[in-house]
Amino acid sequence: MKTLLLTFLVVTIVCLDLGYTLICHQLHGLQTCEPAQKFCQKRTTMFSPNHPVLLMGCTYNCPTERYSVCCSTDKCNK
């Protein structure tokens, strides 16, 4: 009986880990990423002179812009 319970516990842990999704900060709160989105980003962009805009959240690729941060662990883009 103990062996059966231990086996069930191990299978449950393995199955739960397969459904892991990344969590990233947004401007207001947290965002659960889609399975294909493997990175969190934080970047500052200039839409017009003297008006910076901060963008945060999940992304498929790391941005290559000068003022950007890209990471791949939960809540790493604060």
UniProtKB/Swiss-Prot annotation:
Q: Where is this site: Important residue for interaction with muscle alpha-1-beta-1-delta-epsilon (CHRNA1-CHRNB1-CHRND-CHRNE) and neuronal alpha-3-beta-2/CHRNA3-CHRNB2 nAChR?
A: 67
Q: Which domain of life is it from?
A: Eukaryota
Q: In this chain's numbering, which residues are marked as the site (Important residue for inhibition of muscle alpha-1-beta-1-delta-epsilon (CHRNA1-CHRNB1-CHRND-CHRNE) nAChR)?
A: 45, 47
Where found in the cell? Secreted
What Pfam families does UniProt report for this protein, alphabetically?
A: Toxin_cobra-type
Example GO molecular function: ion channel regulator activity
| Site, Important residue for inhibition of muscle alpha-1-beta-1-delta-epsilon (CHRNA1-CHRNB1-CHRND-CHRNE) and neuronal alpha-3-beta-2/CHRNA3-CHRNB2 nAChR: residue positions | 28, 43, 51, 66
Question: What does UniProt give as the signal peptide span?
Answer: 1-21
Cystine pairs annotated here are 24-40, 33-58, 62-70, 71-76
Major site of localization recorded for this protein: secreted
Concerning Gene3D superfamilies, the annotation shows: CD59 (2.10.60.10)
Tissues where this protein is expressed: Expressed by the venom gland.
Give me the Gene Ontology terms describing cellular component.
Answer: extracellular region
What residues correspond to the site Key residue for inhibition of muscle alpha-1-beta-1-delta-epsilon (CHRNA1-CHRNB1-CHRND-CHRNE) and important for inhibition of neuronal alpha-3-beta-2/CHRNA3-CHRNB2 nAChR? 46
Alphabetically list the UniProt keywords: Acetylcholine receptor inhibiting toxin, Disulfide bond, Ion channel impairing toxin, Neurotoxin, Postsynaptic neurotoxin, Secreted, Signal, Toxin
Positions of the site: Key residue for inhibition of muscle alpha-1-beta-1-delta-epsilon (CHRNA1-CHRNB1-CHRND-CHRNE) nAChR? 44
* Family indicated by similarity: Belongs to the three-finger toxin family. Short-chain subfamily.
What role does it play?
This three-finger toxin binds and inhibits the nicotinic acetylcholine receptor (nAChR).
- Name-wise, this protein is Short neurotoxin SNTX6
- Provide the species name: Ophiophagus hannah (King cobra)
